[in-house]
């Protein structure tokens, strides 16, 4: 139902945010920003 849709959206957003943070960390560590 609606709850499962909301949960799916939150999980997708969380993955995107985590991915962005990981990319920024890799960038800073490698010094290639």
UniProtKB/Swiss-Prot annotation:
The keyword Ribosomal protein does not apply. It comes from the Eukaryota. Coiled coil: none annotated. InterPro entries: Antimicrobial_frog_2. Its main location: secreted. GO terms for biological process: defense response to bacterium. Keywords: Amphibian defense peptide, Antibiotic, Antimicrobial, Disulfide bond, Secreted. Disulfide bonds join 27-33. Expressed by the skin glands. GO terms for cellular component: extracellular region. It is found in: Secreted. It holds the Pfam family Antimicrobial_2. Antimicrobial peptide. Belongs to the frog skin active peptide (FSAP) family. Brevinin subfamily. This is Brevinin-2CDYb. It comes from Rana dybowskii (Dybovsky's frog).
């Amino acid at each position: 139902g609606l709850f499962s849709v909301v949960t799916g959206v939150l999980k997708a957003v969380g993955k995107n945010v985590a991915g962005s943070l990981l990319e920024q960390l890799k960038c800073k560590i490698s010094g290639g920003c």
